[in-house]
Amino acid sequence: MRILFCCEFYAPSFGGVQKVIQEIAEHLVRKGHSATVATTKVKGRNFDELNGVRVKEFEVSGNLVCGLEGDIEHYKKFVVSEQFDAIVIKAAQQWTFDCLWPVLSQITCRKIHIPCGYSRLHEPAYQGYYQQMPDVLRQFDWLIFYATTYRDIDLAKSHGITNYSVIPNGASEFEFAEPPRFDFRKKYGIREGDFVFLTVGHPRFQKGQLEVTQAYERVKLSTPSVLILNDRPNPDRFSKSMTFPDKIRRFPRAFMNRHRYPLRDFRRALRNIRRQDGKEVLVTNLERQEVVSAFFSSDLFVFASHVEYSPLVLFESAAAGLPFLSVPVGNAGEIAAWTQGGEICPAECDERGNVRVEPKVLAQKMEDLASDTNHLRYLGEKGRVNWKDKYSWGKIAAAYERVLMGS
């Protein structure tokens, strides 16, 4: 099959959308299919093919609510006129989906859409946009959701739409088959007996790093511990991973200047942690290989993100055999049930679906899990076994292939 994937961003850009589409596209290429990705032109992309996947760039941006800009007609003409057997459009609220609304009826190949959560469903500015959504969805041959209950699938169900599948996210069997060879703890000066809490996400303060830090400030363990706060690598804007001579690793100044709102609380938490014996914080911008190694080298993954759909990091934590503790954001509770690799910490959810956890509540859950080594071992083992059995990208890609072929 000749398959076109449409997504706002793609490699070398980082993010969940990019990761999912790259994994699915590359797996399908390995199965003998042809895959092309239509995406935004970005600085630093010096290729038009990556691992067998053709990349077609367009200078377009925005969405129907904020406004579309760029060579929109070029993109529409490409999608309509090229001879693809199937098209997969990832995510609403962005140009690769919104630009095609007027021409969906002209696309004659099999059309598949992944709504991706509808993060702005409850925002007043998007009311008109989502009033039109049911009619737009009905023009697709098939829909793919990541959760059995969430904003996007609930909207589809409420309008009688039944042509869909629930296909979970996953983690790479190539990245997580075995722990990386280099010693992460040794490289960053972390002692073998230290209990390591890990959190990963970008942008930092939307992914709950402040709440995790404030919770860690309150955690009391009988053994030394380390909290690793990792953001995505970005050599143009952030420094490399810091060395480990001090207890507190500071954010690059450029980042701090752009996030003043939570910085006062964040700095206060860091100062308080610094005064406590046996506790350290490591703030990093690790490259991908080191992130994978951190998953294998840590003791508990802690996730306090404010808004998500189906967080990849929870599948990756399970794949590494690393127990996770997450707030009930997106379908985190469903992922915990599917993988049996983690637990959910209670947290409040506002009218727009944003989750906020009380640091003292999160701290107590972190303490409870860190103190129960047998339960941690059980969660880690169950998570890894279930990932191997059901949630590797190879198995997920096979489910996509069946949808693409209409079988």
What are these regions (language model features)?
Residues 65, 92-96, 110-127, 142:
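A short, histidine- and acid-enriched strand-loop-helix "catalytic/donor-clamping" loop
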